[in-house]
Structure formats: C-alpha cells, structure tokens
C-alpha cells in the first residue's frame, strides 16, 4: 500500500440514503440510484472517513468468511467505483496513532 493510500480515507458523501428497492438495496442520491449487493453495502457503510482500506478488507473478509486474495481487488475496485459515482470522497487520513 502506498503512502498516499495510507493518508487518504474513504468517507460516505452527504445526501446519500440507503433504501430497499424492488430489486434489492439501493444507494440513492439526488440524481441517481445505485443498486448494491450485500457486500458493497457493507463496504459503503465502512466508509466513515476513519477506516483505512486495508482495515475494510479485513472486515469484509471476516464478515463474509472470504480469503483476502479474493476480497482485496474487489474492495479496491468497488471503492474506485464509489468515488467515480460520487458515493464517497477521499479525505485526509491523519488518524494519529489509532
């Protein structure tokens, strides 16, 4: 993991709501709806501006009893998609010695 990744943390964007839609769970903003599966929803909920991506990977592995080598690329891809779609923003990650 690069120094830049360690210093940036994903945080949910404001104005996004979680709703149950006809086809499953949705992340709903002012202009768009994003259908998400259980794993993506769990990941989005971890985007609190305090949790590092590597900690998210560990949490998803534990929650879904899945191996890290399978989870890590998926988590990074979903975080990139969330950022591209405006569902999260990357914030400064100076958390001290947490």
Where are these regions (language model features)?
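Acidic, low-complexity/disordered tracts enriched in E/D and polar residues
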Residues: 1-45, 91, 95-96
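Long, charge-rich, low-complexity alpha-helical segments
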Residues: 32-98
């Amino acid at each position: 993991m690069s120094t830049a990744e360690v210093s940036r943390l994903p945080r949910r964007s404001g104005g996004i709501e979680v709703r149950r839609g006809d086809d499953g769970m949705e992340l709903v903003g002012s202009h768009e709806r994003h259908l998400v599966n259980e794993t993506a929803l769990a990941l989005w909920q971890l985007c609190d501006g305090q949790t590092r991506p590597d900690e998210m990977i560990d949490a998803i592995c534990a929650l879904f009893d899945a191996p890290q080598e399978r989870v890590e690329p998926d988590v990074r891809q979903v975080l990139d998609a969330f950022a591209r779609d405006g569902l999260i923003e990357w914030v400064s990650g100076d958390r001290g010695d947490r």
